[in-house]
């Protein structure tokens, strides 16, 4: 289906149900700030789960958020090959392995994922990792289902940094009227 066939999709954004938008914002503000797991790892996990799920919109958002956190473009690009990249520690790889598996389907997660996680993380930290993956799954499904038109700042970043590793905006392009006006950080939905 061509992007132009998603007529009126901007009318399906969460802000048209203000109570839902506010509750989702509360959840984002609870899950994403650093606690036992820092913000960078949380955004790496979110972006990895979005890569596995195939939501191009969330891939651009997660990557742009990593950029806003000061993560080098090379590390963001290396997420596409994290298993062999020297940019990532064994602890990060364990978290990203879970994110990729759960991002595909929870049924893909294996006991070995938890064996590796427990080498690096406490139970509380693993719960945080799971929360990021679960919230990411909700956002992936919402945004990919309605083919959200990605904001320009995220698109500009993704075109520059992600396109060289195979990213494209897919169905998440459209008219200026349909386009989101900014990244969630810009709107205060989530803190940097």
Residue locations for each model-derived region?
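Hydrophobic alpha-helical segments
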Residues: 1-192
């Amino acid at each position: 289906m061509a992007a132009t066939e998603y007529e009126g999709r901007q009318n399906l954004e969460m802000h048209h149900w203000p109570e839902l938008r506010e509750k989702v914002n509360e959840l984002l503000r609870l899950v994403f700030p650093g606690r036992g797991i820092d913000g960078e790892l949380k955004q790496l996990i979110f972006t990895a789960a979005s890569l596995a799920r195939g939501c191009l919109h969330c891939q651009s958002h997660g990557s742009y958020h990593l950029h806003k956190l000061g993560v080098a473009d090379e590390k963001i690009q290396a997420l596409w090959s994290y298993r062999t990249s020297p940019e990532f520690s064994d602890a990060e790889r364990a978290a990203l392995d879970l994110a990729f598996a759960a991002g595909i389907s929870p049924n893909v997660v294996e006991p070995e994922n938890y064996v590796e996680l427990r080498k690096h993380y406490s139970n509380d930290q693993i719960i945080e990792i799971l929360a990021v993956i679960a919230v990411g799954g909700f956002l992936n499904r919402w945004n990919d289902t309605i083919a959200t038109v990605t904001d320009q700042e995220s698109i500009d970043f993704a075109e520059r940094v992600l396109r060289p590793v195979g990213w494209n905006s897919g169905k998440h392009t459209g008219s200026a009227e349909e386009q989101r006006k900014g990244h969630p950080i810009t709107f205060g939905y989530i803190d940097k």
